[in-house]
From Swiss-Prot:
GO BP annotations, alphabetical order: regulation of carbohydrate metabolic process
Organism of this sequence: Halalkalibacterium halodurans (strain ATCC BAA-125 / DSM 18197 / FERM 7344 / JCM 9153 / C-125)
Alphabetical UniProt keywords: ATP-binding, Carbohydrate metabolism, Kinase, Magnesium, Metal-binding, Multifunctional enzyme, Nucleotide-binding, Serine/threonine-protein kinase, Transferase
Miscellaneous comment in the UniProt entry for this protein: Both phosphorylation and phosphorolysis are carried out by the same active site and suggest a common mechanism for both reactions.
Gene3D superfamilies: HprK N-terminal domain-like (3.40.1390.20), P-loop containing nucleotide triphosphate hydrolases (3.40.50.300)
Active site per the UniProt annotation: 138, 159, 177, 243
Subunit (UniProt): Homohexamer.
Protein's UniProt name: HPr kinase/phosphorylase
Pfam families in alphabetical order: Hpr_kinase_C, Hpr_kinase_N
Region named Important for the catalytic mechanism of both phosphorylation and dephosphorylation: 201-210
Lineage: Bacteria, Bacillati, Bacillota, Bacilli, Bacillales
Region described as Important for the catalytic mechanism of dephosphorylation: spans on this chain: 264-269
Amino acid sequence: MAKVTANDLLERFQLELLSGEEGIHRSITTSDISRPGIEMAGFFTYYPAKRLQLLGRTELSFYKQLSPVDKEERMSKLCTYDTPGIIISRGLEVPPELLKASEKVGVPVLRSNITTTRLSSMLTNFLESQLAPTTAVHGVLVDIYGIGVLITGSSGVGKSETALDLVRRGHRLVADDSVEIRREHEDTLVGRSPELIQHLLEIRGLGIINVMTLFGAGAVRPFKRIALCVNLELWDQKKVYDRLGLSEDYLRIMNVDIPKLTIPVRPGRNLAVIIEVAAMNFRLKRLGINAAQQFSDRLNDVIEEGEQEF
């Protein structure tokens, strides 16, 4: 899980730092945003201090009606040593009591000109993306006809060579060798390349090549949602492979199941074309067109008709 601080928000959303510079590098550990409306009324029993606090027009309008003593009390309770930051939206004027309390405990106070609702949505999306669970998988990720295909298999089976052929056919490389995967939602996995090897492809006997330099910017993309896994394995004569496409297998990554196809590798098989067709067939299945199921249904109908004749 990546580390996110108020300083990252400062740079990302071009915020204005007003006070509490001492705590600008405090870690933000949750993507939940708190709008402390009930806290402005004095109820701090269940105050989520570890969340980012967002103050808008509603909270500050109520705050202005408080007595000077209550104002100081509310802001001193709002600013704790666990609070990662407080953001003021709409470019509103910041209460001096907040500036004083934030400096005392080192809580960064930031200000933005963006409306409260929109800012809350932007912050939540950014934090969910950055704080999402992360893992790394050995394989190649390619965007094929808009489908994120994760190509896996043992070392030397031909993953990178297949990816190179796919790039030559007009598809886009996301990552080679190591794929960093984030679970950004309950059922969404997004893969990207580590920065060190971004746009690079390693071909045995040839070495490392830069795909973007060779094929242009259209041959790469920074990230892609993973929708399908294609596992390459050396052909095993003793193993029975699926010939109809009715059986479904899945690869589980961080409790998310990804449809998985196993493609046996042997001389003479054009893996790039096979994976290309697999991606197109996957799209058809999502549209409700399943050729294997249609064939099975027709076959069953023929068998039933034959039984009725006898």
